[in-house]
């Protein structure tokens, strides 16, 4: 298994520096005991109540983009405290990554309360995903009902021109907006027809169109 070591202390005091090194040494030993290959070590000095930590974002990038099987930490509070801990554990488990701790000399054993909260978060996320998909379908139906014809309006507009700017059918954005669709619904509709666009992109393109029209006048 490929492992990532994460060590954290909350202050810059000299004794905390020693604690960081001790955490790394203990976690390296656990990796060796379990036949793990340590591919990354992340150490930082920051409050566990904060999510805006460089080390946390580096950890999330690694588990999403690299072949990481397990996170090694001294104990679960090193990942974070309070809601920050729950949020980070949810992100880690969602990627199918395990958490091993020095305290357990193996895989993290969550408290009953933390397990229940994580289960609730997963259920809520699943329903959010279902609602998002329903919004896409509703947006597509509403667009078609208001005269949007994808086989005609989006014909030959998927060609990759190599431009960095995302190509979107601005005429359809304007028309769908005129039919009272929100920017979120327009983005969902276009994604349903194969365009990888966000609400922000749709809004930006619409604003550019309005500004160009005003300039032309």
From Swiss-Prot:
Ranges for domain Resolvase/invertase-type recombinase catalytic: 2-147
PROSITE patterns in alphabetical order: RECOMBINASES_3 (PS51736)
CDD domains for the chain: Ser_Recombinase
Domain of life of the source: Bacteria
SMART domains: Resolvase
One GO term (biological process): DNA recombination
Name of the protein described by the UniProt record: Resolvase homolog YneB
Originating organism: Bacillus subtilis (strain 168)
Gene assigned in the entry: yneB
């Amino acid at each position: 298994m490929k492992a990532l070591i994460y060590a954290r202390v909350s202050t810059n005091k000299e004794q905390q520096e020693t604690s960081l090194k001790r955490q790394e040494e203990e976690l390296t030993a656990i990796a060796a005991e379990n036949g793990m290959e340590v591919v990354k070590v992340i150490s930082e000095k920051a409050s566990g109540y904060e999510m805006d930590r460089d080390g946390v974002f580096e950890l999330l990038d690694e588990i999403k983009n690299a072949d990481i099987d397990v996170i090694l930490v001294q104990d679960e509070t090193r990942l974070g405290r309070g809601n920050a801990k729950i949020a980070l554990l949810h992100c880690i488990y969602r990627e199918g990554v395990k958490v091993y701790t020095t305290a357990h000399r193996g895989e993290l054993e969550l408290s009953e309360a933390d397990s229940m909260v994580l289960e609730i978060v997963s259920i809520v996320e699943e329903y959010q995903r279902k609602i998002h998909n329903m919004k896409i379908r509703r947006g597509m139906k509403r667009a078609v009902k208001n005269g949007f014809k994808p086989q005609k309006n989006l014909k030959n507009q998927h060609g990759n021109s190599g431009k960095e700017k995302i190509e979107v059918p601005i005429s359809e954005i304007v028309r769908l907006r005129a039919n009272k669709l929100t920017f979120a619904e327009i983005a969902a509709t276009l994604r349903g027809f194969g365009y990888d666009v966000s609400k922000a992109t749709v809004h930006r393109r619409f604003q550019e169109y309005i500004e160009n029209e005003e300039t032309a006048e």
